[in-house]
Amino acid sequence: GYVNKENQNVDSGYYMAIEGKKAVESYTYTNPFFSLDHPMVRVGTPLHEPNVWPSEDKHPGFRSFCERYFWNLFDLSSQLLKGFSLALGKDESFFDSYFHKSDTLSSMRLIRYPLLKNYPPVRVAPDGTKLGFGDHLDVSLITVLFQTPVPNLQVEIDNEWYDVPTSDSDFLINCGTYMSYITNNYFHSPNHRVKHVNAERLSLPFFVSVGYDTVIHPFTPAGTEIINTKHDDNPPIVHGKFLEEGFDALVVKNGLT
């Protein structure tokens, strides 16, 4: 990602459209606390990058809005995780000890899919569906998605693809691979994809993640062993390493947005 030639970030920044090749453009930003003097940034910890913002003169208020929206979504996610905690048979504060503003690796992505007369070539799935983004699992704890009301998402259930209803008055909540991992697949991370729709639309996913050094020991919720096909706990893994491996696999499979 980049805003200009000086941006050396791996993730944060602007991913531009490329005429004749790529129509989608996006802007990614992460924890606003990740400044150059943040201890994890200072020592070069992977996935810790200061955000690169467009000029305030050219885009007045953009940065302040984005940072405010990030923390609003963080607070919403904190409340959602209380519900997940209770559903897992834990105290509602279970995730509070892992999900902190100071070190969260959560990221926000602003994605624009444009309406074009001459759209660049798009990928086609084996079933003939034209794709805006191929099938994948979200590399996150959970994902909180806002999108404009243009139907495009599909979820895979029993080898069949189903359209996901869309609305600009609701958030769509999805379980990511880390939630699946720490609950031994009790909360399944669904495979999903984005259909190609030649229409102007926006997609704003907030990928919820805990800190890099965080380790949540996997567990099977009490009383669920009968319906859960996985009986052995996954081995503990440092969250940052889990994310790095997941992101690398996602880029290899589908490329960058």
Residue ranges and their predicted role:
Residues 1-257:
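Peripheral, non-catalytic segments flanking oxidoreductase cores
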